[in-house]
């Protein structure tokens, strides 16, 4: 049980902190929340700065163009960038946090050379075409068909909840390549260019007013067979690799941010008199304990990942279950502090309160996560 | 940074679990429910195995280990529902003769609680009274913001406090029927302050809270296992009840509580920070109490009987939750910490 960082890790932290101190003051102002082209430009420019400074793909393997950093260094990176108020991964989320690592793990040498460098340089933005209108949490029920025609797959169907689809260059797309076998076995993982003929994007407006995700309609889209990652009909296994990345490390920086917001809430409550409310004050105290523990659980998970081959384990499900609810409780407490100010849709805490509602749904609902924990960790029998 | 247990720590945990399984199995546990006097032979055996002298330096006859190791050992004691003033004997092993070896049994008593309760009064050789914790002015009903929000608590934390010792037979007491059948209690009616004992009281309080939290963690983990074990075997409507999502979700939530508490307790053992200890106690108390209740629910009607062990975990969890800082005190302290 060692929570001290090694001299090398402390040195890495110090260099990163110095660099952030130098470059952050010169960044342009952040674009408006609803300006997606503006946000793409901003996020990819930041990615380019990371690339030029040697911080791009920190946790990716070196032979994939990354820095081969340890999970602990990645943790330090997320901690320091959040603490310094650096831009979040934003539109590069899918490319950097799961499509890229999946391509690095499962792609052929040619596929890696073609797709990975542009992600790292900030040239290409990826989106995720997993979910479908009739297959939400039941991902394996997907129906988008891919029919082989010479050197191409001809793909027809519809995807939904596709984040950043409006501004993406590529899509990690799950398709059904064999409808006649048990449903987990007939799926393939394809890389689809978003400008291919037959691709139509219809942005969806979230309850927060943002168009961060979209429906994507596919009408006889031709995708070269060479864009398939992994074997034909082996896409489910490839997908599980992707999802383990998504659940394991995607929220690390956010815990740091939540702890910062919690401190700001307490100070705001002290300033406006809400601090005298025993219930609110105790709620904030309890959340202090929750987020401190979630940070320690993150360190635990990272320690496990560092010694278990890099793919995060079931600790990710435990983390996601508690974190998603704690985040909602945090912003509900923010509304208590704000009083009538909680009706101001432009307030940062109000916008975050609205978006926090997606956390118990996205990346596997809390109910699905509980099934996973009960069956895979606790060994309870499969339900019907 | 590598937060995982070292090989030696895992060996210590496994060895403790084996020792307790052998010497305090279910039969012994149920016998203790009927006759809750402490087993002096077992106490000496634990002393001989280094249970109490764990953190004493080797030149003083101890094992020379640290707080994380003590946490692992007390987690196991919590799992096994081992009764007795374990935290007191662990903390006073270097301060009171005979405690390290398990020859003498001492209890700790918090003077500012009302009533002032004494665990295992019939089994103790000495009682150590500890004063100067979070005062009731800060933490009791209606308190909290007398001299500014959290001010009373902050002041109480800063107080150094003191401790004094008394032979067990010289303490005036009144009967008190304990909720926990495994932990007899007496109400102390006369707080003697004649023989001061030189102790770092703030540190003792912090460590007592952490080691109590470690026992709560062990209990919380054990009740997950009990619930899961029952859910796999108990059949209703022709299938194990564990196939039902409602049961699955109760069990999953129990594991989440236990693992969150584990992260907090282990980290506090490493950092020894007061705020982390406070948070760990809060989360471990909740995990132990809520998990015992959910375990009872999974057991259905049988869970409500004396025959099943679930009530023993719940009652002990309630008892421990009242000691070394309640939820209300912890939340107030942690809220105060946000402004620091």
What kind of feature is each model-predicted range?
Chain B
Residues 1-80, 148, 210-340:
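Alpha-helical interface subdomain recognition
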Residues 81-87, 91-225, 229:
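FAD-binding core of flavoproteins
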